[in-house]
Amino acid sequence: MFKFILPLCLILSLNSFAQNCNCDSVFIQSKQLVEENYAGWFDKITEKNRPDYINWSEKKFNEIKGVTNDSICAKQLQNWISYFNDKHLRILFTKPKSNTTQSKTNALKILTHNLSVDEANDYFKKTKSPDPIEGIYSHPSYQLAITKIKPNLFYATILSTTNENWKPNEVKLTIIKKGKEYLGTFYDGDKSDFSTHKVKLEDNILDFDIAFFEKQSPNVKNKLDLTEYEISKDKDAPSLHFKENVAIWKFPTFYSNSEEQTAYLLEKYKVQLENTSEWIIDLRGNDGGDYRVGWQLINYIYTKPIIKYNAESRLTKQNNEMWFNSFMKSYYEQSDDKIKKVIDEEVAKMNQNIGKMYNGSNLPFETITINKPFINPKKIALLIDENTVSSGELFTMLARQSDKVVVMGNNSGGMMDYGNILRYKTQCSTIRIQVPMDRMLWIDTGFFVDKEGLKPDVYLQVNNLIEQAIDRLKK
């Protein structure tokens, strides 16, 4: 029998910053992570196919031997992991950023500037003619004070932050003024790298291209709504427009700030939505995220109880720690004692069940009911295609249980049977492995999403889907 004998502790001790990696070791580490943490392991590898899997792994390991190029290594690893036929289980390759001049073997040097909230407020009171870009700005993770350090050079100093990698008095952004234009340097949240961007000040909004900050003081006469501004600039933001008395929603993704942006659109167009009898919900190309983004529309969609299947989690020491650090740690640190107690109890239960597939509810599914659903819309066309995957598929499964909804388009991509993904680092800084922690319990009924994707109720031609959907709604 083919065996891998390099200890994981040795792998983890190797230099994690190498740009030319030892692919043999990365393979062994990835294989061990999958076998010990992947939620689909017990479904995918059985006594019947185990010899085939062992032979496959031995063959791929022999092909990988001697590979030192990161990119080639990542492709070879992806080829190996394709055995599991799970698009959520995959290798992630991050090409080194070309604008990074800092040696990867050294930590990125972060500037500091001693400045408290009181000192910042005092600075702006005493500065008679501050530069337009100077001020105190807010962001979901930071409060920053942008002050002039010397002519045409500004620091955005952290006054407070919820990001554990940063602390007050560290400089999050540097900005250089050239004439009437600004050029800024943005330091990543994990302090691993930096990038340069054109910077614009639009009334009270500091547009840093990849992040937006809202000016709190000094006061600005014209104030833009930050969420509306984000929607106008964010290609992945949800959108809503009306055509031929049809409300047309587009959800490119359920990631990023989509939840807040969707809530904003629902409130802004509330009256119009409640009086529009035909809707289109366009999920083509939706690559997932949090299905609850779209679930905010449930009062409009609902007609009868909705069955929502639960999941069971593969609980391991590594998965539990990664889950908490990835999804809960920041929220936990900002929570009050009451919420912390609830989280502590759940984490304790998870740790008590290490080595098991764990379903906290002990129920295969739950039934969702809505007491006062809206009358309108009366008809909903929900559009999907081969690029609708993950949480986009989950939302489709829930929404199509409504009598209002007809799913149109083409088969979805099929990537939902195993989810709640964790991203593990490998010894190679450019390669990570994405491992699903959860197994959906509809699998036990013999139903699978991943095999063929979700089938629409009505197949449509690829071109002009919106027009086709409108025509069918009007019939």
Language-model region placement:
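A short, sequence-level motif marking secondary-structure junctions
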Residues: I149-P151, N219-K221, M437-L441
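Long, contiguous juxta-domain segments that are non-catalytic but functionally important
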Residues: P7-C9, I210-K233
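C-terminal "post-core" interaction segments
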Residues: N20-N37, L206, E228-K475
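N-terminal start-of-chain detector that recognizes signal peptides
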Residues: N106-T112, S116-E119, K128-P130, N219-L224, ...
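Generic low-polarity alpha-helical segments
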Residues: M1-K3, S13, G135, I205-F208, ...
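Bacterial Sec-dependent N-terminal signal peptides
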Residues: M1-C21, S30
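Terminal targeting/pro-maturation regions of precursor/exported proteins
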Residues: A18-F213, D236-I280, R284-D287, R292-G294, ...
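Extended hydrophobic/Leu-rich segments
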Residues: F194, L224-L226, L473
